[in-house]
């Protein structure tokens, strides 16, 4: 059994175990279409493949998701490698800001069309709600992470605090 095949099988077994329907329901919902290359891509890739994909082929939404990425287990050497890759991707200086803003705005419109609401109790999807706050943070991180690495936090509240401290947005806007 080759390394790639082994890790693909291990990943599938892990996914099956956390998504299995039990008497209490499912532990987690996992949408494996949301991975590099979608359903055509492998379930598990090498660190080098992950890095190459993120540098050259990843979509804006994938980098937005990466702003929340974190290593939850594994040896310190592996954690450091992955965190370094994530940091380097998020702080890449060659990002086209106009295109980035357009892509983020387009995604937000698409989400609003599919999940938007006028219900004031829907704190997540209402205009000005949690999703808008997260999109503002994610855009700000991708647009400014090269100049202000201190803003590259995983937690939205910490991101907002660092964005305010760096004076990227005014205190009133934050």
Where are these regions (language model features)?
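A nucleotide- and high-energy phosphate-metabolite-utilizing enzyme signature
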Residues: 1-174
